[in-house]
Each structure stands twice: as structure tokens, then as C-alpha cells.
């Protein structure tokens, strides 16, 4: 199976059909993945608000979107290299469950708190940074490491979720464009966002 990345630059506006409310979750779900009987720490942004004025090394922030049967942790080796070699700053991760109603028989692009919504965007620490992650490997309660086929959801739902991440990154950074980098299915999610937003 070949895997490849797409690179898109997007300047799509802020129009949104519905107001997005970020779903609360226990704090430990943001920082750890619970898999089988093990606990794995997740990449976490270092709060830079008090220590310095953030100065981006890039003209536009990058949003990394993982592929099918994967998670945002896919990007750790590459971004750790960027951090050490280019002093990039990790801005945070957007955790989105794409099967929030836990019903595989229906599908929609509605967001929490709408009744029967398939998509839940979870509250997470996001700051001004050079790059961000989108993570679809999320359960309806906000824990990372899905058991509800969130990763395998329709590309249309992934595109709607990418839109939320793009809008929030643009709001946090003050930039009018972002760079989307998607691996495999993440490239299709990026294309869906660009073509249908």
C-alpha cells in the first residue's frame, strides 16, 4: 500500500453553518492514551504565553492530519526533528470523535451538542504555534485510543472536522491561511475540506 502526503494552502473564510461547542472531558484524557492495560503519554504543548512572545518561524501554521487506523502521534518523529533542528513550536492537538453517537448505522455532519450528532470536538490546550495536530483517534468520552471507529468515518465528516481545526488555528495565530499536510486518508480529509467548505 502506497502512502503519500498532500500539501494544500487554504485561505477559506470563517463562515460556519453551526456554532461549535467544545465538549468537556477529564483532563487526563488530553495528555494520555489508555490502550489495553497501558498508559502512553501524548505530545503536549509547552505553555509559552508567560515565558516569551511567540514568533513563528513560518509564514503560515501547519496542520498535520493522520491517516486511516492511525493517530496524531504518527507525526511525532517528524515534528520532534522540526522542533530540534528548526526550533518549531507545537501549538496543540485537536481531538475530534467522528462517531460520537456510537451508532454505526447512521451518519451526519452535526456537531455536539446537537442531539444525535456524529462529531464531538473536545476542549484542549491550544496556543500560538508553528504546527498543530488533528486527531480522529478519539472516543465519545474524549479519551484517546478509539473503540468506536472514529478513524474509519466518512471523509465528509473528516472534512467538517478539519474545518473546525483550521478555523481555530486561524483564530489563535491571527493568520489568514494554513498549510494542511495529510498522510493517506488525512490528505483526502484535507481535500474534502478544501472542496466542500
Spans of features found by a protein language model:
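Bacterial N-terminal signal peptides
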Residues: 2-10
Amino acid at each position: 500500500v502506497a502512502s503519500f502526503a498532500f500539501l494544500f494552502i487554504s485561505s477559506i473564510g470563517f463562515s460556519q453553518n453551526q456554532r461549535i461547542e467544545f465538549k468537556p472531558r477529564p483532563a487526563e484524557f488530553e495528555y494520555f492514551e489508555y490502550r489495553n492495560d497501558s498508559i502512553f503519554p501524548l505530545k503536549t504543548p509547552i505553555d509559552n504565553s508567560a515565558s516569551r512572545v511567540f514568533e513563528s518561524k513560518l509564514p503560515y501554521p501547519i496542520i498535520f492530519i493522520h491517516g486511516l487506523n492511525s493517530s496524531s502521534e504518527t507525526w511525532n518523529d517528524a515534528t520532534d526533528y522540526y522542533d530540534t533542528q528548526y526550533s518549531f513550536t507545537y501549538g496543540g492537538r485537536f481531538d475530534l470523535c467522528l462517531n460520537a453517537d456510537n451508532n454505526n448505522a447512521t451518519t451526519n455532519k452535526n456537531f455536539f451538542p446537537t442531539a444525535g450528532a456524529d462529531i464531538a470536538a473536545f476542549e484542549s490546550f491550544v496556543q500560538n504555534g508553528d504546527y498543530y495536530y488533528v486527531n480522529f483517534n478519539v472516543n465519545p468520552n474524549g479519551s484517546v485510543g478509539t473503540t468506536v471507529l472514529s478513524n474509519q468515518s466518512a471523509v465528509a465528516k473528516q472534512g467538517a472536522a478539519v474545518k473546525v481545526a483550521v478555523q481555530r488555528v486561524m483564530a489563535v495565530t491571527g493568520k489568514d491561511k494554513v498549510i494542511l499536510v495529510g498522510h493517506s486518508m488525512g490528505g483526502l480529509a484535507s481535500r474534502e475540506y478544501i472542496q466542500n467548505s
